């Protein structure tokens, strides 16, 4: 259970950072009078999500390899 708390906490932390960045960016767009297109929103979030998923996957694979080989 403890091993699952760390990745979940990391995902929560990264989510909060991305939300604050989006709010800052939204505030800057409102000042300029321009709007972001849906494609820009999706692209930025998709890249962040891919990076987080990749890191979490690599960490889980490394943990599994460590447990299976007994080199922990």
From Swiss-Prot:
Q: Where in the cell is it found?
A: Secreted
Q: Which GO terms describe its biological process?
A: defense response to Gram-negative bacterium; defense response to Gram-positive bacterium; hemolysis in another organism
Disulfide pattern: 66-72
Q: List, alphabetically, the GO terms of the cellular component aspect.
A: extracellular region
Keywords assigned: Amphibian defense peptide, Antibiotic, Antimicrobial, Cleavage on pair of basic residues, Cytolysis, Disulfide bond, Hemolysis, Secreted, Signal
Signal peptide region: 1-22
Transmembrane residue ranges: none
Main function: Antimicrobial peptide. Active against a variety of Gram-negative and Gram-positive bacterial strains. Not active against fungi. Shows very weak hemolytic activity against human erythrocytes.
Protein name as annotated: Brevinin-2SN4
* Organism of derivation: Sylvirana spinulosa (Fine-spined frog)
């Amino acid at each position: 259970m403890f091993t699952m708390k760390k990745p979940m906490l990391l995902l929560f932390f990264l989510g909060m950072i991305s939300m604050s960045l989006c709010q800052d960016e939204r505030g800057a767009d409102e000042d300029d009078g321009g709007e972001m297109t849906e494609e820009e929103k999706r692209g930025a979030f998709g890249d962040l999500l891919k990076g987080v998923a990749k890191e979490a996957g690599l960490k889980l694979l490394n943990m599994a390899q460590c447990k299976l080989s007994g080199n922990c």
